[in-house]
Amino acid sequence: PGYSPKGPGLGWHFGYFSFGDIAEKQIANDPNLFFSYFIKTYAGKKDIFTPELLAELIEPYSTRDKLKAAFGYYRSKKDSALQNEALLANNKKLFIPAMALSGEKGVNDVLIKEMRAKFVEDPAKLEAVILPNTGHWLIEENPEGVEKSLSKFLFK
C-alpha cells in the first residue's frame, strides 16, 4: 500500500513505523503534530477528536522510549506473518467462535474478508460487524456500537 492517485494507501505507516528508529527520531520532537494528523486521517468522525481528547491519546507516545515501545508492534509484524504462514501451511485455523469488528469508514470489510477466507476453520463461526459511520478508532468514534457488538458476541 504505497502511493496512488488517491493518495497514500491505508497501510503506509506499517513500513514507516517498522523501519529502524527513524520514525521515533522524527516524531519524538513533536508527537502532537504527527499524531493529530495521523488520528484524524483514519477517523470517520473527525470532529470528536477535540484538543483534549487528542492530548490524552497522544500522551502515551510522548517520548522516544514510548514511541519505541509502541512501534515494536510494527517491527514484530514480519515475525507474526511468518508464524501465521507456518500455521496456515499446517492447516491450523481458529476453530472457536471468533469476532472481527471494523469501521465502515476505516478498512470496512477488508480484514473481515481476509479473516473469513484464511484464518477461521468454519466461516459461519465468524461474527463480523462493520460499525456504520465509524473509522479506525472504534472505541472513540462508536463506543455504544463496540459495547453492543462485544456484549452480543461474548454473552451469547
Language-model regions: role of each:
Residues 1-130, 151-152:
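Flexible "cap/lid" subdomain of the alpha/beta-hydrolase fold that forms the substrate-access gate
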Residues 123-156:
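Catalytic active-site module of serine/aspartate enzymes centered on a nucleophile-bearing elbow/loop
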